[in-house]
Amino acid sequence: MGLPFKVTPAVLVPRPDTEILVQAVMDRLKAASSGGDESLRAADIGTGSGAIALSLLHYLPTLQMVSVDISAAALAVARENAAALELTERIAFCEGNLLAPLAGHMFQAIVSNPPYIPVDDIAGLAPEVRDYEPRTALAGGPQGMDFYEQLVAGAAVFLAPGGFLALEAGIRQAGAIGALAAKDPAWGRQEIIKDYAGIDRVVVLWKK
């Protein structure tokens, strides 16, 4: 992402794979604006250090962001990073669970890198991840799908026509996310984007 981010034990360390998610959202928001000067609005769910939201703001000067996290400690880190990058005027931070703080607002994009590690796999993670990064930012339920299910079920109502939901996916989860969306009449076209290792890493769902 090319920007410096402070991290603490309250947030995940930004991963190289997340650059794929940021680039995917940037490309699609740029296309949506058609090179014009109109303001764009996006929301980042589970913002953590703010790396995704702040990277988008840095590279998209007409973008306004809402960043949500259930952790007050994580939001404190994200606010520090926003101040250090001089981006505070274009971002609002909301403490709350997933999509709930978005009530009454509409966006061109919703982006999330949610917890997606199956609970039984946590013990097998590298010690520097398992022992030092917040479990709440890692564990995604029995199959790692709990947060994807909630986001796919609820995000469309907060998207403007032609808007999209972009999700970072764990290994072998992109297809399952697509299958969830295929059953939901709110979603139309799907895209799957591979990471640097050729793994399906980002799922983009377009609102009908």
Which residues does each PLM region occupy?
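Conserved beta-strand segments of alpha/beta enzyme cores
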Residues: 4, 64, 90-92, 188-191
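Mobile active-site "lid"/loop adjacent to the S-adenosyl-L-methionine
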Residues: 116-147
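Conserved SAM/SAH cofactor-binding pocket of Class I
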Residues: 13, 19-124
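Conserved Class I SAM-dependent methyltransferase catalytic core
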Residues: 142-206
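Class I S-adenosylmethionine-dependent transferase superfamily signal
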Residues: 25, 56, 129, 151-155
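C-terminal beta-strand of the catalytic ATP-binding
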Residues: 116, 206-208
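Conserved adenine-nucleotide phosphate-binding loops and their immediately adjacent elements
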Residues: 1-7
